[in-house]
Amino acid sequence: MAHMKTRLVYASILMMGALCLYFSMDSFRELPFVFKKSHGKFLQIPDIDCKQKPPFLVLLVTSSHKQLAARMAIRKTWGRETSVQGQQVRTFFLLGTSDSTEEMDATTLESEQHRDIIQKDFKDAYFNLTLKTMMGMEWVYHFCPQTAYVMKTDSDMFVNVGYLTELLLKKNKTTRFFTGYIKPHDFPIRQKFNKWFVSKFEYPWDRYPPFCSGTGYVFSSDVAIQVYNVSESVPFIKLEDVFVGLCLAKLKIRPEELHTKQTFFPGGLRFSVCRFQKIVACHFMKPQDLLTYWQALENSKEQDCPAV
């Protein structure tokens, strides 16, 4: 038994040493998979002057060219919220480029009409979500560091902007803050045909550092700036939530809970008015369902619900 305990202690020391070595490395620029901050240029930027009117919360929504219906549903629901509890809120969509000239032209027209699209010249694809997310961080870094908070989410999400704003005001933590649905002990998937496969060459360790589900996470604006600055010194991984988690680990920023009860639902949630009044984000939302649920919530603002 004593021999077994000794082996476990040695194994733990070796693992901690490996992790310390990994996160203390200054640069991974010799590896083929490294994010380049200076790569690409902005094709579309939204109509906002953060210096003159700093927002309290900016929501960055990853989307694709074909998801126009989802963007329109968001614009008619939680994305139309611009003033919540006296705080300015703005929602923008993150896109890459398409091989289709028609789609690119349509997106340009959409951007001119709504002035809410952020776009750079990289191919819009699922496995470029890390590039898309880092584009959002870069935009905050260059154009809107004055915002207090940022939320990164997806186009198939319900977001309760009002409740999120309420919780952020109560939390009142405006530096080194990162929250969402926390995954503290996830491990890399090594099966090659799995959608989330990560090779040992990309990431040789058996566990990821704590990160938040990419369906929706919220952070203070200084974190966006710090993540952007440190991003070139972290191995590039196509799983954007894991990549951001690696950046957080490098920065020694640990994700924390926003509320004592669960408020982020990456696995979805059955709709009810009272339940959705007290959540922040819910996944697997079809455009028509989002419109229906939002109208139900709007119609029931005076409804008495049990305290949460």
Swiss-Prot record:
Cellular compartments per GO CC: Golgi membrane
Stretches of the chain found on the membrane's Cytoplasmic side: 1-7
Metabolic or biological pathway: Protein modification; protein glycosylation
Membrane topology of the entry: Single-pass type II membrane protein
BP-aspect Gene Ontology terms: lipid metabolic process; protein glycosylation; response to bacterium
Family matches, as InterPro entries: Glyco_trans_31, Nucleotide-diphossugar_trans
This enzyme's EC code(s): 2.4.1.-
Residue intervals on the Lumenal side: 26-308
Keyword Glycoprotein attached: yes
Membership in a protein family: Belongs to the glycosyltransferase 31 family.
Protein known as: Beta-1,3-galactosyltransferase 5
Organism: Mus musculus
